[in-house]
Amino acid sequence: MSQHTPDLPPELLPLAQMPLLKRLAARFFGHGLNRLRAQHRASWLHGQADGFRSGHTAGVEYGYQEGRLEGLEEGRQVLLIRDSRNTEHRPPGVDDRLFDDWRLPLSAELKKRFKADVARLLPAAAQPSAAQWKMIFSDTPATAVIAGAGAGKSTSLVLRLLLLHHYLGFELDAMTVVTFTRESRKDFITKLTQVFALWGRQLGAREARELVRTFHSRILPMVRSLPGFERLQAFENLSDRLQSGEDEVDSNPFDLRINDAQRRHLNACYQALYRDDPRFRVALQPLVRHALQLKELERDHPDVQKRMAVTELAAKRDEELCDTVEDLWFRAGAWPIKGIEPQRQRFEINGATFHSHGYCAELDAWVVLGFDPRESPQLTRPGAKLTVRAEWAVKRTLFQAFCRKPLIWLDSYEASKRSAGAFSAQVNGGPGFDYKVKGELASAPLLDCFVAAAGFIENLGLEVGDAVAGMSFAQDDPDRFFFEALSLFWRALEDHLLDQSPPIMSYNRMFALFSERSPENFKLLSDACLRPMSHLMIDEFQDVSPQIVSWIRASLAAIRCRGAALHIGRAAQHSSLLCVGDDWQSIYGWRGSSPKYFIEFNKEFPSPGTTRVMLSENYRSHQHVIDAAEHIVRAAPAIAGKKAKASGEATELWPVQVLDRDDQGLAQRLAEHYERGDSILMLFRKSSDKLLIENVISQIVNVDSSLSPGSRRLKQLTYHSAKGLQADAVFLLGDCQHLSSSPYKNQVYRMAGLGKDGDAEPYDSAQKDEILRLAYVGITRAAKHCYWYVDRQEGPSGNAPKASDRVPRDKPYFQDLRQAT
């Protein structure tokens, strides 16, 4: 609003301030102006200015008061209606923790009392260290204990159990201690009963066996509690000998050897499937041809070069040679063979004509009979200069180098009997031939290969059919047909086993029934059946498989889902998980185990609180043994911050000696230690080495085996079998080497989410790390002395990764006595 100030006259006085005459005159003239209705301009302007001044002042004051009140009111309204909340729709989060948010009720007074009792009842050597007490008194739902070799974890686990049961009143049927093998289970039960007895608690054998379990002995009662499976048998436990219930749960599920009882079921399933499923028969044909077909030989091979010179001479005598060999097979009752039509077929070999003995229509392949090794090697045709065996060797070499047709070469009468089922659509037994999956070190009977491959896939938590569907192979790769046949066979085998009376099921199938893929099955379990999984303590956790991990997580989730109703009226409430392990001792990746679940424990087992304990004391070995083993394994991925310290009795530091393979030298050194009264472990990389070395240490073996079991001081085992053992002197025979690449295992490893992102060969990479861990396990068995004998590597295998590559020459804890190559 614009403001205007009018122009005022110079001076205009009020009447009261004027003299009388002027006042009278002003009134007169003013009255006249009124009568004339005229305006006195100066007076009007003066009045206007005076009114403007007084009106403006009053208006400003009034407007200020009015505007202030209105502004406050409007401001107050804006403040009240402003909504600063997030308008985006946000649903509740998912609670994926496996445990309730709780803590073990351990008061300071209880801890003090328990420590005093331990100091009073256990010898000084068995007193826990500070780290072990941290493990025993862990009050969080989840606890990960990194316990290196010789860390004294067993005693700590026993004291943890004692704390829960004796001092907190936890019922035994709410707890489970899981050990990895039958042997470790027996050892732990012995220690448990001894310690409990010191506190006046006599633990019965049955109670102890119910408490201390293997994974497999815990899952079996779960499945047997389901309707219709009360008498269920585990396929891995089948045997022709009578078994008690305890023998059954104590059997070794990791024994990959197929016994007669198991093979009968495999063969019966194979026969039915071969008879009824054309697709299965078609898938098998390339496998049979690949297995039985004569293996090719390069033409520049020395044997080929030598025998090419007599090609014409060999061709001239070939028909007579065929007659001679055929007569031998006929007299042995091995010819003719069902499914093979006896007929001669001519082959052009290096420009000359040779013959076969028959044709197999089922395989679309020609058949040649070989010279059975049981026949006399001096057998000679009339007038011939060479023996039949030598003539046949020449023919075999020429066929290997120059024959490109499908050809089956039967080397012996026994081989023909084993393979009889492969030649005919009428199968009366098993497949009758061996197969070698790429990446495996040796061939094995086909059905054994099926069991091993399916077991590996299922250990990774995968279904066989789904895994096979996700694989891919080259068009002509026989493994493509192997896995197609496996997929068909495995489903048929599971159906066949369930049809038996009583029904049969593999352990892997049992774990899958109660895995994270099938949470609804837990609704079928009673509280009493599920409750023992509430408070789990697991030893050797680094060797668990994805399948086992899925079962553990699903069980803990089911327990939390049931809530307080599962524990009404009981001292043991909620649930907990305590895992003890050493990722440096994870050595079972070849059958599907992985240290990933221990290394990434917090991620794999989400909990409101997790305690991490590092048991760094080593009560077994001196520092040189510890440092040598850790130097080898440190290149493998591991939990950060690991460094063991010798905590046993002070002793002289002997370096780990690395030597060239010398069986006589090994035997002499072993004898010296035995005569000194040392305990000895003789560890082999390959079981076949045991037979070789026993010849040179037979005298000591005989002396030791004549003693009572408790007095024996020599044990011979593979590296893998030695876990948990120790000796004064350890002899390692053989390097730890990664020799082959497995295409199918690399594929299923990726499917299972194992390995690093972007790694095309995750299984092979894991195995290269595992050979370092295997060497670590071998070395850390030694309390005082360790001798490592390795073969000189020649040929293609010499370039393969091996643990001894990491042996340094400039460290005091190693003494490399190998001759430089």
What name fits each language-model region?
Residues 174, 179-317, 374-376, 385-445, ...:
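Conserved P-loop NTPase-based nucleic-acid remodeling module centered on helicase motor cores
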Residues 716-750, 786:
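A short beta-strand element within the Helicase C-terminal
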Residues 396, 546-652, 810-817:
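Conserved RecA-like helicase ATPase core segment
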Residues 150, 154-157, 607-611, 617-709:
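Helicase P-loop NTPase motor core
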Residues 92-149, 154-156, 176, 208-215, ...:
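Conserved helicase NTPase motor core
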Residues 7-42, 46, 50, 61, ...:
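P-loop NTPase Walker
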Residues 352-393, 415, 490, 557, ...:
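Short beta-strand-loop-alpha-helix junction that forms the active-site gateway
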Residues 740-818:
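C-terminal accessory regions
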